[in-house]
A protein has these predicted regions:
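Phosphate/nucleotide-binding beta-alpha loop and adjacent structural elements of enzyme active sites
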Residues: 1-157
Length: 157
């Protein structure tokens, strides 16, 4: 919330009606630089889904933060043009919801010219008592920074 005034434009994507109402209340005094878009973000434009590319392609995008309960792969696939064509973009993508996401997300971003790093800590995708007994701990977040001058993926500072 501290950086809202620094942003030219913020797009918030949300599918849940209850969260739409909460977001509208939270940001009602922030002016026109915040746009709340209702819909599921994925890799196709059908059945109520939309893609980040369909909304933001051709626009300057500096930062993407994504925590969408295991749909990060699909949303990133649907954001390929935005990720490819914004030379100063950074991102923080949650990677603990699905097995293998940290590796997939890192590889995908590396392929698009990002330097990537994975958070040091671990998270459990399920906090129920039974799952804590047999938890698969996963890395929490993949960070990416577009690098025009680096040929060494995996070194984000």
């Amino acid at each position: 919330m501290n950086h809202i005034d620094d942003a030219e434009k913020i797009y918030l994507f949300e599918a849940d009606d209850e969260w739409i109402e909460a977001l509208c209340c939270t940001f009602e005094n922030e002016g026109d630089n915040i746009e709340i878009i209702q819909g599921y973000v994925g890799d196709t434009i059908e059945n109520g889904n939309l893609t980040i590319d369909s909304i933001l392609e051709g626009q300057k995008v500096n930062y993407i933060k994504m925590d969408i309960e295991g749909y990060e792969r699909s949303a990133l696939t649907g954001a390929r043009a935005v990720l490819e064509h914004n030379p100063e973009i950074t991102c923080a993508i949650c990677a603990y919801h699905c097995h293998g996401d940290s590796e997939w997300i890192s590889s995908y971003l590396d392929e698009l010219g990002f330097e990537t790093a994975i958070s040091h800590g671990y998270m459990s995708p399920d906090w129920s008592y039974e799952s804590r007994l047999y938890a698969e701990l996963r890395r929490g977040v993949v960070f990416g920074k577009k690098s025009l001058h680096s040929n060494t993926p995996g070194t984000y500072s």
